[in-house]
Amino acid sequence: ESTLAGAVAHELIERHQKSVIFQQWASIVDRLFFNVIEDQEERNQYRRALEEVDLLIIDEVAANRAKLAESQSSFLGHLLRRRRNLSKSVILITNHAPDSLHRAIGDFSFEAIKAFNPVDIHLAGPSRRPHIGSYTG
């Protein structure tokens, strides 16, 4: 999933000079909720960049089948609504099916996704990641 999203991002950057941010959800949370970015103005600039970039790709949303904390769910919902109002595109990458994603991110965020007229693409098949030694797990 991430490789495909990366290819889309590369195409937009190379051929259409569009701005793209590709971030894991955990990294966004760390930067905004756990003071990885200590300066408030820098955090505000980062948040604005997430809102205004031409294409935002968020990888591993609600990873490990985890349910988002209320503050994270609220932030995601507001971020998606802001991007929708600005007519900015977003790609969410997750291992959740739509029903379990709804439970993991909550009503507010799920309704924000629906406002985009989303396309659910299920990708199946073996992992493309290389094996580690003789371990194939």
Whereabouts are the PLM-identified features?
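Short, catalytically relevant binding-site loops at active-site mouths
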Residues: E1-T3, S27-D30
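Walker A/P-loop
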Residues: E1-I21
